[in-house]
Amino acid sequence: MGMPNKGVVLLDGQALAYNIEEDLKYKIQAINTQTHKRPKLAVILVGKDPASITYVNMKIKACERVGMDFDLKTLQENITEAQLLSLIKDYNNNQNISGVLVQLPLPRHIDSKMISEAIDPNKDVDGFHPLNIGKLCTQKESFLPATPMGVMRLLEHYHIGIKGKDVAIIGASNIIGKPLSMLMLNAGASVSVCHILTKDINFYTQNADIVCVGVGKPDLIKASMLKKGAVVVDIGINHLNDGRIVGDVDFTNAQKVASFITPVPKGVGPMTIVSLLENTLIAFEKQQRKGF
């Protein structure tokens, strides 16, 4: 990895996620003592995509660590849209299920947008339902998508101010880039979102106080593209042929320029998963209050 510069601080998502998990474990135990109930997350996995299987396993292990119940449904690649919608409907109507999550990407013959919209917004712990996205845009309380929520928590934990800062976000996905840009905007940043059609990404990154990237391209962000003292948030996860897992940033060199940087792994990844657990607990508590 090379020696970091003396001044750079690694944004340790793993350590922060561990602390939040301990807190969740305590809360869930207290709820269980009082009500004999536990939050329960339903996870739907379609097909055998290796990365999806890995992510689902990580989510389930995290549920186990905090004492949250889960229900995992693994479905064949060739399941019909109607069958999947029917399963989601069952989970929506099941009072013991607090949150419903469909692991993306889905096979080509299934319309992901329609599936996201089929989940009850009150159980949409991924924060992908149009109603929750709309609430995010209008700053109403909603389930925040887990990765952007995790990024904001990580920056907050390290007292990295966002108000008045220039932020460059590379990647305009509905899951990460767009909601993250909205959270940054809500926190008072001036935000530029770059994507495949952006003429000169350097122009945006070199002027940014905070650079967030999540597109799935190793070494996309080089040290020369960063201004001295930038905060670098690497949301990319790439599995290299030699078995290494790296992000989208040339970490070895970028850490010589940055003031703060997330490692990959152990940076944003653990924060994503713990944010999902937090959303599930919030969903559970809201449903209990409604006498659901």
Swiss-Prot record:
Enzyme nomenclature, EC number: 1.5.1.5, 3.5.4.9
One Pfam family this sequence matches: THF_DHG_CYH
Residue positions binding NADP(+): G171, A172, S173, I196, I237
Involved pathway(s): One-carbon metabolism; tetrahydrofolate interconversion
Domain of life, source organism: Bacteria
Catalytic activity from the UniProt record: (6R)-5,10-methylene-5,6,7,8-tetrahydrofolate + NADP(+) = (6R)-5,10-methenyltetrahydrofolate + NADPH; (6R)-5,10-methenyltetrahydrofolate + H2O = (6R)-10-formyltetrahydrofolate + H(+)
Annotated keywords: Amino-acid biosynthesis, Histidine biosynthesis, Hydrolase, Methionine biosynthesis, Multifunctional enzyme, NADP, One-carbon metabolism, Oxidoreductase, Purine biosynthesis
Gene Ontology CC: cytosol
A molecular function GO annotation: methenyltetrahydrofolate cyclohydrolase activity
BP-aspect Gene Ontology terms: L-histidine biosynthetic process; methionine biosynthetic process; purine nucleotide biosynthetic process; tetrahydrofolate interconversion
HAMAP family in the record: THF_DHG_CYH (MF_01576)
Purpose: Catalyzes the oxidation of 5,10-methylenetetrahydrofolate to 5,10-methenyltetrahydrofolate and then the hydrolysis of 5,10-methenyltetrahydrofolate to 10-formyltetrahydrofolate.
Subunit text: Homodimer.
Family under the similarity heading: Belongs to the tetrahydrofolate dehydrogenase/cyclohydrolase family.
Protein name: Bifunctional protein FolD
Gene encoding the protein: folD
